[in-house]
Amino acid sequence: MEGKRYSNSFTSSEMVKEEGRAAYYKLLDSVRDGDTVRIKRGVYATAEQLADTMIDVEAIVPGGVLCLFSAWNVHGLTTSLPQAYHIAVKRGRKVTLPVFPKIELHHITNTMFDIGVEEQIISSYRIHIYNKERCVCDAVKYRNKVGMDVCAEVVNSYLALPGRNLSLLFDYADK
């Protein structure tokens, strides 16, 4: 995609049209070739831009924690890209979500919510995310929902890490 990079690393078809008709047709060819992904009508991004894009979780879902597929991807425990941002909130909490980006909320009990939360800087955003050990426990806990292949990939990736903390993993598994 030859067009300029715009806010959130996405390109608008209207902005490309301003560069000229040739740039717009080049964008459409890029989509047809698979180099560019159509996010929604009039919004496009490359696969690399999608992989690098992180939202400000605290601004969209105050008190939310990145979890499941999103956390597994950040920690490098899975090779698949999440289709949505997976964010944990305390059970019973009502949250109004934007239309874009796609966010899936997971309501966690108050006793389990704070276990394994750490803070990381990702794409210049301060993000609350579950640590690797909590992510592995969640993969095993939700194995019937996420699939046995994903669960096995997360567990095997964690066990292959040199800095794994098995005692913390077993502590989380007991809770």
Language model segments and positions:
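Short beta-edge/loop segments at beta->alpha junctions of small alpha/beta modules
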Residues: 1-70, 92, 97
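Phosphate-handling catalytic interfaces
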Residues: 77-175
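Short secondary-structure capping/turn segments at boundaries of alpha-helices and beta-strands
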Residues: 72-75
